[in-house]
Amino acid sequence: MPKFRVSLFSLALMLAVPFAPQAVAKTAAATTASQPEIASGSAMIVDLNTNKVIYSNHPDLVRPIASISKLMTAMVVLDARLPLDEKLKVDISQTPEMKGVYSRVRLNSEISRKDMLLLALMSSENRAAASLAHHYPGGYKAFIKAMNAKAKSLGMNNTRFVEPTGLSVHNVSTARDLTKLLIASKQYPLIGQLSTTREDMATFSNPTYTLPFRNTNHLVYRDNWNIQLTKTGFTNAAGHCLVMRTVINNKPVALVVMDAFGKYTHFADASRLRTWIETGKVMPVPAAALSYKKQKAAQMAAAGQTAQND
């Protein structure tokens, strides 16, 4: 109970103290003190015009990234310059992480490479991501090798991939590294187009069937967000993750939120950070989310900040 009273007091104090946006530019101490608290384990926002860090919170904490991995999957596919209209068979045979994972997509049915990319990016379809890797020149292992080589070339020094979907806890990165991935994504306009598609129908062949798919990022449905590229991710180990290239305060930014508590917490944190940047207002964080963050931080400290399955 004493801890609960302290949390309420801290929250009341935070809300009671007026935020002075002019003080942000005056001193580094004022900037640090005025930064908002978030519910997520780590985050970073970078101004894409200047590469200046606007906000960071534990940006170098190495954590599982879940389906954020699919952004790298898409980049490696496009780097290979393979025909986008080629029909690919749904194949997960070399992705053991897929065992027992439900999907509406039928094994061995076929759809174009471009539609595979759409389903992987827009709706985070795991069988689509795995199939893209299975149909890579040189095979599945060559694809994973290319993912890691791409990460290294981008200076993502704390990033590692072992499979293309993000289901493995060993697909890890940091908020800082993921901003580098977002910066690189500017060279892939198709990824931006597909990842921000709100919804679509996918028609498969052999056998023929059609399925509806929707975007996993709820913010793409809001007209007050200008989102140019996005990807969400979730596993129990990674928590809820969100990356976006978007516009905040009339500036293009790369936004990364990792290891958030609750189904909508990563979206709420993105909105909190946007509000702070645009207005200087600090929005409160629910006590349950802060408790989750504290517990995760303790677990990471006990494990020496290594990525482990919870």
From Swiss-Prot:
<dbReference type="GO" id="GO:0008360">
    <property type="term" value="P:regulation of cell shape"/>
</dbReference>
<dbReference type="InterPro" id="IPR018044">
    <property type="entry name" value="Peptidase_S11"/>
</dbReference>
<feature type="signal peptide">
    <location>
        <begin position="1"/>
        <end position="25"/>
    </location>
</feature>
<comment type="similarity">
    <text>Belongs to the peptidase S11 family.</text>
</comment>
<feature type="active site" description="Proton acceptor">
    <location>
        <position position="70"/>
    </location>
</feature>
<keyword id="KW-0133">Cell shape</keyword>
<dbReference type="GO" id="GO:0009252">
    <property type="term" value="P:peptidoglycan biosynthetic process"/>
</dbReference>
<feature type="active site" description="Acyl-ester intermediate">
    <location>
        <position position="67"/>
    </location>
</feature>
<keyword id="KW-0732">Signal</keyword>
<dbReference type="Pfam" id="PF00768">
    <property type="entry name" value="Peptidase_S11"/>
</dbReference>
<dbReference type="GO" id="GO:0042597">
    <property type="term" value="C:periplasmic space"/>
</dbReference>
<keyword id="KW-0378">Hydrolase</keyword>
<dbReference type="GO" id="GO:0071555">
    <property type="term" value="P:cell wall organization"/>
</dbReference>
<dbReference type="GO" id="GO:0009410">
    <property type="term" value="P:response to xenobiotic stimulus"/>
</dbReference>
<dbReference type="GO" id="GO:0004175">
    <property type="term" value="F:endopeptidase activity"/>
</dbReference>
<feature type="active site">
    <location>
        <position position="124"/>
    </location>
</feature>
<keyword id="KW-0574">Periplasm</keyword>
<dbReference type="InterPro" id="IPR001967">
    <property type="entry name" value="Peptidase_S11_N"/>
</dbReference>
<dbReference type="GO" id="GO:0009002">
    <property type="term" value="F:serine-type D-Ala-D-Ala carboxypeptidase activity"/>
</dbReference>
<feature type="binding site">
    <location>
        <position position="231"/>
    </location>
    <ligand>
        <name>substrate</name>
    </ligand>
</feature>
<keyword id="KW-0961">Cell wall biogenesis/degradation</keyword>
<comment type="function">
    <text>Cell wall formation. May play a specialized role in remodeling the cell wall. Specifically hydrolyzes the DD-diaminopimelate-alanine bonds in high-molecular-mass murein sacculi.</text>
</comment>
<keyword id="KW-0573">Peptidoglycan synthesis</keyword>
<dbReference type="InterPro" id="IPR012338">
    <property type="entry name" value="Beta-lactam/transpept-like"/>
</dbReference>
<dbReference type="GO" id="GO:0006508">
    <property type="term" value="P:proteolysis"/>
</dbReference>
<dbReference type="GO" id="GO:0043093">
    <property type="term" value="P:FtsZ-dependent cytokinesis"/>
</dbReference>
<dbReference type="GO" id="GO:0000270">
    <property type="term" value="P:peptidoglycan metabolic process"/>
</dbReference>
<protein>
    <recommendedName>
        <fullName>D-alanyl-D-alanine endopeptidase</fullName>
        <ecNumber>3.4.21.-</ecNumber>
    </recommendedName>
</protein>
